[in-house]
């Protein structure tokens, strides 16, 4: 079982976030020497409207919990060739949030916490119900 540390979220989001991360990593064994990983979540269906997601986790040693660094989602623009544009960026390490229309603000803002809770609920539902989702875990150097 993996252990996680999540900062910058209200108490009501800690347990759902731990469950979400545990579910993503449950079928994967990560070597003890790896200190940072990226989880890339994509749809296998190229016609899907599913937004690609990148989640990064970091730890100082195999004996310490994984710390959630960030969650980023991307809009995919298709005009000849696929192109990704940052949509949502929850930076837990720095405790800030970014969206292209509102720019950067505190992760602690109530409306950002509400957005994160809604996003977490929606993505968890999608991962459970959509079989055409791939999760690739790679080490980051």
What does each of the following model-derived ranges do?
Residues 1-38:
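Short N-terminal edge-element motif at the start of the domain
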Residues 96-141:
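Low-complexity intrinsically disordered segments
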Residues 7, 40-42, 58, 91, ...:
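A structural detector for beta-sheet-dominated domains
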Residues 26-67:
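Amphipathic, interaction-prone secondary-structure segments
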Residues 61-114:
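An exposed acidic His-Trp-rich patch
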């Amino acid at each position: 079982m993996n252990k996680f540390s999540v900062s910058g979220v209200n108490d009501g989001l800690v347990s759902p976030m731990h469950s979400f991360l545990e579910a993503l990593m449950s079928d994967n064994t990560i070597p003890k020497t790896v200190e940072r990983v990226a989880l890339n979540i994509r749809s296998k269906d190229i016609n899907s409207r599913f937004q690609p997601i990148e989640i990064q986790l970091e730890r100082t040693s195999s004996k310490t919990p994984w710390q959630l660094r960030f969650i980023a989602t991307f809009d995919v623009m298709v005009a000849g060739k696929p192109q990704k544009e940052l949509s949502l960026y929850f930076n837990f390490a720095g405790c800030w949030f970014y969206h292209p229309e509102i720019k950067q603000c505190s992760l602690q803002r109530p409306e950002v916490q509400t957005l994160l809770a809604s996003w977490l609920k929606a993505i968890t539902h999608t991962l459970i119900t959509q079989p055409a989702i791939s999760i690739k875990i790679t080490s980051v150097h």
